Amino acid sequence: MVGVIFGEWLLPSVFSSIHDHRHRVVRLKRMLKQRGLLATSGVGFMMCSFVAGLGQSAAAPTPILVELFTSEGCSSCPPADALLQKLDALQPVPGARLIVLSEHVDYWDQEGWKDQYSSHELTNRQKSYVSELGLATAYTPQLIVDGNVELHANDPQQVQSAFEKALKDAKIPISLDSVNFEGPEEAATVRGHLQVDAGSENHNADIYIAVALNHAESQVLRGENQGQTLTHVAVVQEMVKVGKVQKKGNFSQDFEVKLKPGTKPGEVRIVAFVQERGSGKVVAAASVLQNQPGTGIASR
């Protein structure tokens, strides 16, 4: 049993009424259907707000990848963004290292506020999960844990169960080394070396590198979150496939990822993960914080 405390550490939940959200849900369902993200009509949404605080951090050897699909245009997302920040900072799961990624989708951008961190590629990534996990629809805020467990980001019991499941799954070794930034800020590149040891296990998996902002903040001027200052953690700027692991094989290779213009090396983290094709299961993950140009701080 994972020692995640969702009791006295849980701050009072803030649930918006069904009446207040009904018009929003209907509009979002129509929007998602038009964009091909709603697989089945008539499926309801659970998008309730909550604020969660978790227990104290603990040393953790097992990496768990936690992806949050979110948007600054969604009024149910700020509490989930806050939860992700707490998971990252407090590391409340003994025996685990939570590696978080905030992935901003773009299907809310037509609803009054364009999220500056949104990406159609990340929308497509969420859509792939809808297919792989047999879901009816994409929605926000949604958590994906280790690529094969999906849950509403406002349900602490589901979050706890997902971490319990993830801790039972063995991971293969992965390492990020010699991570450095090169070039001017307006056209910087991150380079490093990635090694994956699949050992004797059979795998058919893709290897990804994600570059994410450690911290981001926005003043929202329109839309459902109008007037709010929103903060985020590990906001994905780039996510690229750099290789693959097949059958009983290892991977050892240098990688290179071009950063978005203006991205400062001291403001990002580099995340590497190995994801099985078909099932989406994440079998390896690692992260490096980049506190200053040319200096990688290993394994967060």
PLM features per residue range, with description:
Residues 8, 47, 73-76:
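The N-terminal extracellular segments of secreted preproproteins, especially immediately downstream
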Residues 12, 51, 77-80:
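General secretory precursor processing signal
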Residues 55-56, 300:
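Basic/polar N-terminal segments that are highly enriched at the extreme N-terminus
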Residues 114-142, 146-300:
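Short, conserved sequence motifs used for protein processing/export or organelle targeting and
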